[in-house]
From Swiss-Prot:
General function of this protein: An outer membrane protein that may participate in pathogenesis. Some human Lyme disease patients have antibodies against this protein. The Mlp proteins probably undergo intragenic recombination, generating new alleles.
Subcellular location: Cell outer membrane
Protein's membrane topology: Lipid-anchor
Keywords annotated in UniProt: Cell outer membrane, Lipoprotein, Membrane, Palmitate, Plasmid, Signal
Lipid addition sites, N-palmitoyl cysteine: C18
Protein name: Lipoprotein MlpA
Region (Disordered): 26-58
Main subcellular location of this protein, as a coarse class: membrane
Induction info: Strongly induced when grown at 35 degrees Celsius.
GO cellular component, one term: cell outer membrane
Biased composition (Basic and acidic residues): 38-58
């Protein structure tokens, strides 16, 4: 009976020591998981990049003159919805429209230039309200250079 008691005590000690190792292992695993989580969070925080708007994507493809006239057009259209609609058109048509605006505004000089540019803004607003397909030399022409 004594031997059984001694063996039983040894068994309990052995079982207890195994359990304590498992606790340490669990604690280490928990700490490693937390540190991995922190590492992952820092990586996730560094990588999220705000998607670029249509305007930013278009600006990357435009020349400096075209960017200037895009700003002018944004101001002319005023309503964000109209400008967003304009940005939805085909890139080549947008570039053609901006080049047309540049050529027309280059004609405006002299005493009445500011008044003529304001009138041209209104003309552009009206021309673009029907879409970009008809925009150009037919319906978006300034009175600049007509001798006035």
């Amino acid at each position: 009976m004594k031997i059984i008691n001694i063996l039983f005590c040894l068994f309990l000690l052995l079982l207890n020591s195994c359990n304590s190792n498992d606790n340490d292992t669990l604690k280490n695993n928990a700490q490693q998981t937390k540190s991995r989580g922190k590492r992952d969070l820092t990586q996730k925080e560094a990588t999220p990049e705000k998607p670029k708007s249509k305007e930013e994507l278009l600006r990357e493809k435009l020349s400096e003159d075209q960017k200037t006239h895009l700003d002018w057009l944004k101001e002319a259209l005023g309503n964000d919805g109209e400008f967003d609609k304009f940005l939805g058109y085909d890139e080549s048509k947008i570039k053609t429209a901006l080049d047309h605006i540049k050529s027309e505004l280059d004609k405006c000089n002299g005493n009445d230039a500011d008044q003529q540019k304001t009138t041209f803004k209104q003309t552009v607003q009206g021309a673009l309200s029907g879409g970009i397909d008809g925009f150009g030399s037919n319906n978006a022409v300034t009175t600049c250079g007509n001798g006035s």
